[in-house]
C-alpha cells in the first residue's frame, strides 16, 4: 500500500506540461499528465487556444491558454486551422513566444502555495524555445518525445544523410539503395521523411540541440520495442531517458479533438474474432479522389470485413465520402468519421490495422497485439513503417502508393494467408513483451518509478 505521508509530499509538487497543439502530440502528453497525476503530482497544462482539448474531461488539471490569445497578432490569427500550413504555428511560436511563456511561468511559480513547489516543465520536443526560458527561471525542463527512438537516431544522422546526397530532391537514381549506416532503410524512405529538408533543417537542428540540453527525455516507447536504438540515445543525450509506453497506461479517447462514433462497438460485437480490418489514416492526412477510390476498391477486393475511418476533409475536394459509388459498402464494411481508436484496437473482432504509420497509432497497435498494414504520408511515417515491417516484422509496408491489387494482397496476407502467420505471431509476442514490461521489475515499470523519483528530487 502506498505511504500516505509520501503521497502528501508528492501532492505538494506541481508539474507544468506544454503540448504542441496537434492530435498526435496532444494525446501522449495528456496521457503522461494523467500518469503523473496518479503518482501524486499536481498538474497544470499550458496550451494554445487553437485545438484546445475539452477541459471538462480533465477536472483534476488546471489549464492556462497562452500564446495565441491576441486576435490582432496576424502571425497566428491568419494561419489556416487545417492542412500543412496549420503547422506553421510551431516555428512562429518558437520564434516569438519566449517572453509570454516566461511571464506565464513566473506568474505560476510566484502564485504557488507555500507548501507547493513547481518541480519542472515538461514540453513536447518541438517546443525547443522553452529550454532557454526554463533556464532563465532556474526551472528544470524535461522533454516528451512523441516519435520513436529510431526516428531520433535518423534525426541525428541528418548531416551524414546530407553529405551522402540522400536529401537531394532531384537525385532519383538511388531510391531503392540501402542507406549507409541504416541497412533497414532505403534511400527513398529518407527522401520521403525529409522531403521538406530546407524547412525542417533549422527546426530539427534546434530541437535536437535543446533536447540534449534538457534535464531528461521521456519516450513514448518501451525498451523491448527499440532496444537496438538505446545505445544511440544514451550516447547523444547526456540527461536520463525514461521509456514509458503511454497507451498501456491510459486510452487517449478523452483527448480527441473530434467526436467519436461509439455505435461501431455494437457492429464489432457481431463480428467473428480477428475478422475485421480497422482502417484509419490519422487526424491530418489527405488523399486525392483517385487514390481514395483505389483504397476503396482494394478493401472490397480483399474480401475481408472492414471498419474504415474517413475523417471529414480526408478526401481533397470532398466533404466526406461523396466519391464512393452507391452500394459500395455491401455487408462487409462500415465507414465512420472518427472512433476511439485504442478501444477499437482492443476489441476482439479486430484482426489487423491499416495505418498511416504515425507513432501513436503504431504503438497503440503494438500494445494490443494487432498486426499492421503500413502506408505513409511523409515525416516520421516512412521510417516507422520500415522499422516495424522490416525489422520487427509485425506488418506489411505498402511502399509504392495506392494500387488496389497490392492493397488487397497485403490485407489478405496480414489477416488470413498462411504466409502471414509469422506476422500475426510477432505482433502477439510484442504485446506480451509490452505487458511484461509493465509488471513490477519490468523495464517500463522501473522506468516510470525512476521518472517519479527523478522529478521528486528536482
UniProtKB/Swiss-Prot annotation:
<feature type="binding site">
    <location>
        <position position="25"/>
    </location>
    <ligand>
        <name>rebaudioside A</name>
    </ligand>
</feature>
<dbReference type="GO" id="GO:0102380">
    <property type="term" value="F:steviolbioside glucosyltransferase activity (rebaudioside B forming)"/>
</dbReference>
<dbReference type="Pfam" id="PF00201">
    <property type="entry name" value="UDPGT"/>
</dbReference>
<feature type="active site" description="Proton acceptor">
    <location>
        <position position="25"/>
    </location>
</feature>
<feature type="binding site">
    <location>
        <position position="27"/>
    </location>
    <ligand>
        <name>UDP</name>
    </ligand>
</feature>
<feature type="binding site">
    <location>
        <begin position="356"/>
        <end position="364"/>
    </location>
    <ligand>
        <name>UDP</name>
    </ligand>
</feature>
<feature type="binding site">
    <location>
        <position position="155"/>
    </location>
    <ligand>
        <name>rebaudioside A</name>
    </ligand>
</feature>
<feature type="binding site">
    <location>
        <position position="283"/>
    </location>
    <ligand>
        <name>UDP</name>
    </ligand>
</feature>
<feature type="binding site">
    <location>
        <begin position="146"/>
        <end position="147"/>
    </location>
    <ligand>
        <name>rebaudioside A</name>
    </ligand>
</feature>
<feature type="binding site">
    <location>
        <begin position="338"/>
        <end position="339"/>
    </location>
    <ligand>
        <name>UDP</name>
    </ligand>
</feature>
<protein>
    <recommendedName>
        <fullName>UDP-glycosyltransferase 76G1</fullName>
        <ecNumber>2.4.1.-</ecNumber>
    </recommendedName>
</protein>
<dbReference type="GO" id="GO:0035251">
    <property type="term" value="F:UDP-glucosyltransferase activity"/>
</dbReference>
<feature type="binding site">
    <location>
        <begin position="380"/>
        <end position="381"/>
    </location>
    <ligand>
        <name>rebaudioside A</name>
    </ligand>
</feature>
<comment type="function">
    <text>Involved in the biosynthesis of steviol glycosides in leaves. Converts the di-glycoside steviolbioside to the tri-glycoside rebaudioside B. Converts the tri-glycoside stevioside to the tetra-glycoside rebaudioside A. Converts the tetra-glycoside rebaudioside E to the penta-glycoside rebaudioside D. Converts the penta-glycoside rebaudioside D to the hexa-glycoside rebaudioside M. Can glucosylate rubusoside and rebaudioside A in vitro.</text>
</comment>
<feature type="binding site">
    <location>
        <position position="25"/>
    </location>
    <ligand>
        <name>rubusoside</name>
    </ligand>
</feature>
<dbReference type="GO" id="GO:0080044">
    <property type="term" value="F:quercetin 7-O-glucosyltransferase activity"/>
</dbReference>
<dbReference type="GO" id="GO:0102381">
    <property type="term" value="F:stevioside glucosyltransferase activity (rebaudioside A forming)"/>
</dbReference>
<dbReference type="GO" id="GO:0080043">
    <property type="term" value="F:quercetin 3-O-glucosyltransferase activity"/>
</dbReference>
<comment type="subunit">
    <text>Monomer.</text>
</comment>
<feature type="binding site">
    <location>
        <position position="359"/>
    </location>
    <ligand>
        <name>rebaudioside A</name>
    </ligand>
</feature>
<keyword id="KW-0808">Transferase</keyword>
<feature type="active site" description="Charge relay">
    <location>
        <position position="124"/>
    </location>
</feature>
<comment type="similarity">
    <text>Belongs to the UDP-glycosyltransferase family.</text>
</comment>
<dbReference type="InterPro" id="IPR002213">
    <property type="entry name" value="UDP_glucos_trans"/>
</dbReference>
Amino acid at each position: 500500500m502506498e505511504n500516505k505521508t509520501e503521497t502528501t509530499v508528492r501532492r505538494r509538487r506541481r508539474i507544468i506540461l506544454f503540448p504542441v497543439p496537434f492530435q498526435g502530440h496532444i494525446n501522449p502528453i495528456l496521457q503522461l499528465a494523467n500518469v503523473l497525476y496518479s503518482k501524486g503530482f499536481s498538474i497544470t497544462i499550458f496550451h494554445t487556444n487553437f485545438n484546445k482539448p475539452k477541459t471538462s474531461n480533465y477536472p483534476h488539471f488546471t489549464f492556462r491558454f497562452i500564446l495565441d490569445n491576441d486576435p490582432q497578432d496576424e502571425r497566428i490569427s491568419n494561419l489556416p486551422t487545417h492542412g500543412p500550413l496549420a503547422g506553421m504555428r510551431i516555428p512562429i511560436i518558437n520564434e516569438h513566444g519566449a517572453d509570454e511563456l516566461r511571464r506565464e511561468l513566473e506568474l505560476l511559480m510566484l502564485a504557488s502555495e507555500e507548501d507547493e513547489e513547481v518541480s519542472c516543465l515538461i514540453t513536447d520536443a518541438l517546443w525547443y524555445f522553452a529550454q532557454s526560458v526554463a533556464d532563465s527561471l532556474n526551472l528544470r525542463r524535461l522533454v516528451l518525445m512523441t516519435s520513436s527512438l529510431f526516428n531520433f537516431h535518423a534525426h541525428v544522422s541528418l548531416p551524414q544523410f546530407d553529405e551522402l546526397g540522400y536529401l537531394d530532391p532531384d537525385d532519383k537514381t538511388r531510391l531503392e539503395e540501402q542507406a549507409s549506416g541504416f541497412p533497414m532503410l532505403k534511400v527513398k524512405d529518407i527522401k520521403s521523411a525529409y522531403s521538406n529538408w530546407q524547412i525542417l533543417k533549422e527546426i530539427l537542428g534546434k530541437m535536437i540541440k535543446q533536447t540534449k540540453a534538457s534535464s531528461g527525455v521521456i519516450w513514448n516507447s518501451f525498451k523491448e520495442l527499440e532496444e537496438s536504438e538505446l545505445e544511440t540515445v544514451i550516447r547523444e543525450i547526456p540527461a536520463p531517458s525514461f521509456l514509458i509506453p503511454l497507451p498501456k497506461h491510459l486510452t487517449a479517447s478523452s483527448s480527441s479533438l473530434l467526436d467519436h462514433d461509439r455505435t461501431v462497438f455494437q457492429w464489432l460485437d457481431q463480428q467473428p474474432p480477428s475478422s475485421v480490418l480497422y482502417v484509419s489514416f490519422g487526424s491530418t492526412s489527405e488523399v486525392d479522389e483517385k487514390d481514395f477510390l483505389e483504397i476503396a476498391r482494394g478493401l472490397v477486393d480483399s474480401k475481408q470485413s472492414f471498419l474504415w475511418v474517413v475523417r471529414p476533409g480526408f478526401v481533397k475536394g470532398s466533404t466526406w465520402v461523396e466519391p464512393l459509388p452507391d452500394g459500395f459498402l455491401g455487408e462487409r464494411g462500415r465507414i465512420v468519421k472518427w472512433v476511439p481508436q485504442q478501444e477499437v484496437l482492443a476489441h476482439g473482432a479486430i484482426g489487423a490495422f491499416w495505418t498511416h504509420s504515425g507513432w501513436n497509432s503504431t504503438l497503440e497497435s503494438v500494445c494490443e497485439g494487432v498486426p499492421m498494414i503500413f502506408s505513409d504520408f511523409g515525416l516520421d511515417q516512412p521510417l516507422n513503417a520500415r522499422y516495424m515491417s522490416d525489422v520487427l516484422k509485425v506488418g506489411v509496408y505498402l511502399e509504392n502508393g495506392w494500387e488496389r491489387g497490392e492493397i488487397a494482397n497485403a490485407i489478405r496476407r496480414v489477416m488470413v494467408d498462411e504466409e502471414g502467420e509469422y506476422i500475426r505471431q510477432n505482433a502477439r509476442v510484442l504485446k506480451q513483451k509490452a505487458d511484461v514490461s509493465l509488471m513490477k521489475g519490468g523495464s517500463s515499470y522501473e522506468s516510470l518509478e525512476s521518472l517519479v523519483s527523478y522529478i521528486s528530487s528536482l
